């Protein structure tokens, strides 16, 4: 059949006891030998190390707004900043590890992790990655790909505040920069922690 098989895999899990590069490189080699068409290189484990995946700030108040269990909501509001510390955003934050996979494998690789500018995307592609995957940049600016075609120095305006992540398992995933307080019958959803 003409179906492409892409496997999204962690390079590191981002927490003590999780998988590290030496283990995941073995997995990648096995997937390459097994005939996968491409690997999408990611990292992190949302329930154990959420900021390893997301980077930036964690909007605790907005995140807890969607929790239905009252005691969990208030507990996370009280100690959440210590439970889920912020990790500074750096564009292409998985690139250093991904380059090790690029050097060791022949299989096509898709880079994912903090791409918000055409300059960095061009750099990643020049480093030998066959494709890139974006999420928050496109959530922030759905027309970003078209703007990159028109502007050499295009950069999206994502602020890495992660309000979109706080909304992810609720009514809709959306960039808070484009929302006003949205009312759904009796419910008003926060658009920021300020």
Outline where the language-model segments fall.
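Conserved small/polar residues in nucleotide/adenosyl-binding loops
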Residues: 185-191
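Glycine-rich beta-to-alpha transition loops that act as phosphate-gripper elements at the mouths
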Residues: 8-12, 108-119
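Alpha/beta enzyme core
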Residues: 1-95, 104
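Hydrophobic faces of well-ordered beta-strands that scaffold small-molecule active sites
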Residues: 5-7, 39-41, 109-112, 132-134
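Glycine-rich phosphate-binding active-site loops on the catalytic face of alpha/beta enzymes
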Residues: 128-147
């Amino acid at each position: 059949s003409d179906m492409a098989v892409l496997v999204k895999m962690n390079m590191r899990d981002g927490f003590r006891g999780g998988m590290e590069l030496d283990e995941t490189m073995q997995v990648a080699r096995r997937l390459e030998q097994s005939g996968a068409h491409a690997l999408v290189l990611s990292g992190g484990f949302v329930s154990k190390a959420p900021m390893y995946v997301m980077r930036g700030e964690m909007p605790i108040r907005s995140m807890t707004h969607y929790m239905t269990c009252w005691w969990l909501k208030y507990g996370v509001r009280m100690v959440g900043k210590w439970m889920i510390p912020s990790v500074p955003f750096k564009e292409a934050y998985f690139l250093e590890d991904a380059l090790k996979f690029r050097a060791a494998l022949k299989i096509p690789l898709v880079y994912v992790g903090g791409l918000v500018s055409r300059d960095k995307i061009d750099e990643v592609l020049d480093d030998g990655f066959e494709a890139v995957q974006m999420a928050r940049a496109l959530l922030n600016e759905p027309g970003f790909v078209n703007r990159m075609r028109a502007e050499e120095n295009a950069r999206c305006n994502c602020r890495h505040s992660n309000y979109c992540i706080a909304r992810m398992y609720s009514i809709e995933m959306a960039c808070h920069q484009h929302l006003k307080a949205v009312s759904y019958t009796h419910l008003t959803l926060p658009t920021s922690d300020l």
